[in-house]
Curated annotation (Swiss-Prot):
Organism: Pseudomonas aeruginosa (strain ATCC 15692 / DSM 22644 / CIP 104116 / JCM 14847 / LMG 12228 / 1C / PRS 101 / PAO1)
Family the entry assigns: Belongs to the RNA methyltransferase RlmH family.
GO molecular function terms attached to this record: rRNA (pseudouridine-N3-)-methyltransferase activity
One cellular-component annotation, GO: cytoplasm
Regions that span the bilayer: none
Annotated InterPro entries: Alpha/beta_knot_MTases, RlmH-like, tRNA_m1G_MTases_N
Full protein name: Ribosomal RNA large subunit methyltransferase H
Compartments reported by the entry: Cytoplasm
Catalytic activity, as annotated: pseudouridine(1915) in 23S rRNA + S-adenosyl-L-methionine = N(3)-methylpseudouridine(1915) in 23S rRNA + S-adenosyl-L-homocysteine + H(+)
Binding site for S-adenosyl-L-methionine: 73, 104, 123-128
Record carries keyword Methyltransferase: yes
Amino acid sequence: MRLRLIAVGSRMPRWVEEGWQEYVKRLPAELSLELVEIPLNTRGKNADVARLIRQEGEAMLARVQPGERVVTLEVEGRPWSTEQLARELDRWRLDARTVNLMVGGPEGLAPEVCARSEQRWSLSPLTLPHPLVRILVGEQIYRAWTVLSGHPYHK
């Protein structure tokens, strides 16, 4: 099974990369979790933010192949418990399609990305810093896998 986190923003602090890698390396070989970084467009004082978001969205969608599943991470999405995420992960595995988890930039996702989404997932009603979201997603995917495999990590 292949999961891909497509996130706007690059050049994260070292602790973010280390946190992400910690959970990626714990996953079994049959569950691949890849990070794809989309460069954040420069936001100047007079920037056309809508245009920048649209460009970032186009870059995100360019990484998605036809037939692949798109899941957006949005505050307005549906919150999943660990057990619900485990059920989704199992469903995705049986579906046998690559799953793309989409995380937008500071202003969120482009409407085109949201329109392509098959599912909308909310990590929290809180506004979370994007570097932390990467680690949180990695940990939650690992935790969901441990639920499915009977591993004692999730008790």
